[in-house]
Amino acid sequence: MQYKKNIKKIPILKHGLRGIIHGLAVVLWFYSVTNIPMADVTAINYLTPIFTTIGAILIFKEAITFNRIFALILSFIGAMLILKPGFEVLSNGKIAQLFSTILFAISYLIAKNLTKTESTHSIVIFLTFFATITLLPFALLIWTNPIMTDLLLLLGVAILGTLGHYFMTIALSLAPLSITQPVIFFQLIWSTLIGLLLFEESLDLFILMGGALIVIAIVRLSANENLSLKK
């Protein structure tokens, strides 16, 4: 019976709770995508790093430094300049997206807690499993048989999404949430570059200004954190 004492107890309930919360966040996100402009969806989505940082400060007692808060605010301003969302009417789609950001923030906070005892592989695998179970009933309600092109695209999305989550989980295990969250805004710059190179989308002054603010915020944060580590 000695071997049983050496078997690590897996926090299934915590993994399951996170998977359900994350799955419901995805459902709300897809609902908002079909009901409001994509710029508004993306803009509201960038409240997630802010909610996550607030949660990290309250729950994990992470240090509140000027550099971290400044980077978060500056990145958010940069994102708004790029997206130029319109918020004239508070519609159901916008409310759904707001709740989605809150649920995603809770999911990341649970993931941060799990990194204390669980491996990156375990966290990603259990999220995929429980989120899939959560999403399955919603998928069956509107199911249509995908063609081969759709299957390949879905496979690509699944692979890239899993890799993204894998590396994000590694980041959560290595650094405080208040440091990792501002970096999320950097994905907007990559999206803009992809749109420019692959889809011939145009640049304007607001995109350049917003991108510059995000880069300045992240570079400044990284430089200051490196200086703090050397002291």
What are these regions (language model features)?
Residues 1-11, 79-89, 131-150, 221:
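Membrane-interface helix-cap regions at the ends of transmembrane helices
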Residues 2-28, 92-100, 145-163:
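Loop-to-transmembrane-helix transition segments
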Residues 19, 23-27, 49-54, 79, ...:
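Hydrophobic/small/kink-forming positions within alpha-helical transmembrane segments
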Residues 31, 48-70, 189-208:
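C-terminal transmembrane-helix exit sites in multi-pass transporters
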Residues 42-47, 114-130, 165-196:
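Helix-helix packing/entry segments at the starts of transmembrane helices
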Residues 50-98, 102, 113-116, 215-231:
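Juxtamembrane helix-loop boundary signature in multi-pass membrane transporters
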Residues 88-146:
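Transmembrane alpha-helical segments that form core, pore/gating elements
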Residues 186-231:
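C-terminal-most transmembrane helix of multi-pass membrane proteins
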